[in-house]
Amino acid sequence: FLIFVLFVFFSGNVFSAPLSEALLQAYNENPVLNAERENIQVSLEEVKISKSQFLPSVTLSGSKSQENTEKQTDSSGANSAFTDVNPKTQSIDIEQKLFQGFAGTASLKKSKIGLTLAQAKLLKTEQEILYQAIEAYTGLIFAEEKLKINQDNVNLLERQVETDQARLERGQITLSDLSQSESSLAGAQAKFLQAQNETVTAKLNYEKIIGPIADTNSLDKESDLNFALPVSLNEAIEISKKDNPNLIISRLEYEQSEKDIIIARSDLSPSAFLSFNSSKSDDVSSTIGERDKEILKATISWPIFNGGKNYASLNKSKNLKNRKKLLLDNALKSNDTNVASAWSNFQVSKSLLNSVTSQVKAAEIANEGITVEYESGLGRSTLDVIQSNSILLNAKISLADSERNYLLSQFKLLQSVGYLNSKYLKLQ
């Protein structure tokens, strides 16, 4: 069973760029992902190369030469008669491998595994790029929200400074109270400038991963993606064991290492091939005008000693297989840990979002009450108002951050089980 999830945060803009469009853009245009797609074509060609080992090789060749003898003498030094010839030869060679120690079969199987491996690596890269795109998309939204919150805070403190100046003239507050307000305003302006820089950085990161964006305000916080999440940690782990590309890659690399042993062992085995040559020669010599010849030859060879190279290659392949087995075992253990971490982060971020939402509501009520009491002269000091504004500001920023983290935690959980791909998200 899976939890069906529909993301809804706030109402979006009428002319907005939804998350699905941004992810589709990254999916189609990201250069790293496109480079990995080319690797699929490379693997397809590798399969064709491996198949060619089972097919005969055919070679056509021809030659023609021209003789021009100016002088010819016999053993006594006297001139002797000669006849120049212009030999021409045409031939065809056909060779078929009959046995090569099962290296050809193992090589073909390895190349087919390599094709599946390339597809798994493409899926892994796709997951990484899509998650980076989600981080960039939500990061830019968060930066814009933080900028707006800080802008509102600057506007609020500017009004408070104006109010405190009037209250100082009426003798309702002291100069130190006004100085506190002015200091708070200066701090808010500094945070606003910092938020502006963070927005620029977030925009550059967005364009690096996803692509150009004309209006950062066009991003929609209301996600149009809907998908299912695992309902339990155990289910998430079981799904990941079957679909996580990291595990698939480790398994396939181990399978390839097994084929490498067979290929290395074939260097110690006999090999056999059959060859056929048919040739036709004209004007061969002064006594032979034409010659047609056919040769059928069977060859068997068995390497006896090659300086120990063959045995060393075999031992190397065995060691590499042991290494891949250890890496596979480690990948299985790491997978459970990574899924458990993603699941825990998802649960914690959901609880934290609920807590921060309540915190913001409480901070808004408290700030409104303290502000009214301050303006009514009911005993609230300037410091009380400043502290209340600061608490509310931090709570709003924490809420925006918690909303983003909750969203990211769900996609991270999808990535950990192997479901963060265009097919599952229905991007295409």
Give residue spans per PLM region.
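Short, charged, amphipathic alpha-helical segments
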Residues: K112, L175-S184, N315, T382-S390
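Membrane-embedded beta-strand positions in outer-membrane beta-barrel channels/transporters
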Residues: S91-D93, Y137, F273, K297-T299, ...
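Bacterial Sec-pathway N-terminal export signals of envelope proteins
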Residues: F15-S63, T69, K97, I213-E255, ...
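Transmembrane beta-barrel architecture of outer-membrane proteins
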Residues: P87-T89, E135, Q180, S271, ...
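Small/polar (Gly/Ser/Thr/Ala-rich) solvent-exposed segments
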Residues: N34, S57-V85, E95-K124, I248, ...
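Periplasmic alpha-helical coiled-coil/stalk elements that build and connect Gram-negative outer-membrane
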Residues: E21, E128-K241, A342-N345, S349, ...
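Amphipathic alpha-helical coiled-coil segments
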Residues: A35-S50, T125-K148, R159, A166, ...
